């Protein structure tokens, strides 16, 4: 079995390096991840900014046999049909306007190109989407919830928390993939985890060591030119 090098808690990554090297990984090694390291990461990330110090994030870490059970349940759930739950929020605006539509399309096509899956291969693309619900083979998974009564500012807090989690993971030699695709199955996941009805599932996250030999691991999505998102007023 292939193994990655575990950088460990003594990592000397700078913040700049962690930001530059963090990517959404969609192929993981089976190598297990230290649960104490994962828990410590979630604790450390709680220093993320939070308006009014509300700290609205609620985390569920799934590993070992419980993750095996979840993957099997979702394999059966998505095998023949794809009947999602009633969703709590739309991942993208409808309709998605430019330039956002083109950015999303290009990222998807770049990924499928690396996988060798053409636009006409609909079944292969559907199967690739199902891989989301196997966490791309990752040995650890995170689900993040937020109370129904929280507003947009608290959702921003949640995003800052998750970014901090991912940077800390990267600084400790781990990779991740935030997955809003799990928002399609909020009731299914909540029932599996025993989460209260008043909480919304925001996303899942695959966590583990990237498979360096997988073609999709070479994916680096483009970023817009600075002039598209920065205006300096002086």
What are the residue ranges of the model-derived segments?
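Acidic, surface-exposed loops and disordered segments
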Residues: 1-234
């Amino acid at each position: 079995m292939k193994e990655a090098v575990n950088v460990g808690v003594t990592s000397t990554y700078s913040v700049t390096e962690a930001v530059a090297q963090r990517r959404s990984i969609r192929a993981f090694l089976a190598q297990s991840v230290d649960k104490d390291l994962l828990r410590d990461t979630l604790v450390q990330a709680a220093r993320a900014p939070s308006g009014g110090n509300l700290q609205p994030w609620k985390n569920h870490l799934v590993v070992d046999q419980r993750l095996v059970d979840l993957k099997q349940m979702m394999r059966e759930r998505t095998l023949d049909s794809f009947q999602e739950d009633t969703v709590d929020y739309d991942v993208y605006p409808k309709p998605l306007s430019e330039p956002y539509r083109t950015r999303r399309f290009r990222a998807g096509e770049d990924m499928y190109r690396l996988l060798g899956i053409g636009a006409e291969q609909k079944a292969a693309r559907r199967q690739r989407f199902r891989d989301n619900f196997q966490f791309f083979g990752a040995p650890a998974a995170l689900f993040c919830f937020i109370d129904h009564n929280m507003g947009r500012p608290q959702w921003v807090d949640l995003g800052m928390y998750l970014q901090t989690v991912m940077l800390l993971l990267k600084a400790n030699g781990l990779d991740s993939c935030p997955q809003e695709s799990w928002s399609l199955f909020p009731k299914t996941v909540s029932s599996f985890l025993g989460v209260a009805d008043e909480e919304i599932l925001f996303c899942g996250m695959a966590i583990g060591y990237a498979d360096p030999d997988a073609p999709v691991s070479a994916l680096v999505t483009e970023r817009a030119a600075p002039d598209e998102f920065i205006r300096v007023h002086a």
